[in-house]
Amino acid sequence: MNSLQLLDYFAMFAYFLVLIWIGVAVVRSKEKRNQYDSFLAADRNMNLLQTTSSAAATDIGGGFSIAMGGLGFTLGLSGSWMIAVSGLSIVMVSFLMVPKVKRWSDKVKGLTTGDLFAARFDRKTGTLAAVVIGLAWFTFVGGQIIAGGKLLQVTLNMNLTFAVLLSGTIILAYTTMGGLKAVIYTDVFQMIVLMVGIVFIAVPIGLIEIGGWNVLVEKFNSSESTKHLLDWGAVGWRQMLGWFFAVFPVWFISIAAMQRIIAARDVKTAQRGFFLTGIPIEWPLFAVGSTMIGLIARFLIPDLSDPEL
């Protein structure tokens, strides 16, 4: 095992140690004013950093982080437009939805989307909404669990099935013990790691490794099969339209987004946090940065069997 491998394992160990410490600290915290408010809505006291980080981490967590690298590998820079659509969506939500939802949730003291439906209509409607939301979220949470499993598979050389089961157990146990407050504190830490890792570490080191941006451009432009990787319009309008219909509505119906709005300190904090998530975090920092990692991987390992790994 060389020094780089040792450094990698040390970094992963330190990362998970910090996450465990955050969860334990939240569970043992005596600052909870109300048990349910703390568990479901983080005491309705999220500041701007927490709101922004948690909203961003909700969208660009493990699933998108892995997927965008894969899009960068196969589609190149134009793959970043998928996240640009998401960024546009959340900016629109910050103006059109955030103020109304935040004021309404504070007025009726609702802690969940089901509570808001119950307050607006009746208890049966609220219960039905909660059931539908729970069923729908199996798919989203499943994507995050699979992303975590793939990470464990690659980094620790695990069987994929076992890695996914382990990932799911950790995620569910962590959330159940610490509630939304633990998730939010974790989101802040993870967003710092993610953005610093992509923008200031992975991309610069990758470009240095291949000899710089000009070398990458020269190599990809030298072949017809890779020229499209540097073309911002390579995906075409049909693909863009598909992304728009698939991605743009998500923030308007996202239960995770609703929960972050409810948990924010006030309307202004929620609105600013969501806007900053769209611009500049999702676009251009994460979108371009993550696709650049895929491009660099295409340069270094063109025959990679699974672009998402």
Range-by-range predicted roles:
Residues M1-I66, T175-G178, T269, F275-L276:
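Membrane-interface "cap" regions at the ends of multi-pass membrane proteins
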Residues M1-N2, L71-L77, M97-R103, K150-V154, ...:
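Membrane-water interface regions at transmembrane-helix termini and the short interhelical loops
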Residues I20-E31, V98, W137-V141, I145, ...:
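Hydrophobic alpha-helical segments and their helix-loop junctions in multi-pass secondary transporters
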Residues S38-A41, D115-D122, A130, V154, ...:
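Short amphipathic alpha-helical coupling elements at transmembrane boundaries
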Residues L40-K109, Q239-F245, P249-V250, A257-D303:
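Membrane-interface helix-loop-helix modules in multi-pass membrane proteins
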Residues M46-T52, A118-R123, T127, Q190-P204, ...:
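Small-residue-rich segments of transmembrane alpha-helices in multi-pass membrane proteins
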Residues W81-T175, G242-V250:
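Helix-loop-helix module between adjacent transmembrane segments
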Residues F117-A119, I296-L309:
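TM-loop-TM module centered on a large, flexible mid-protein loop between adjacent transmembrane helices
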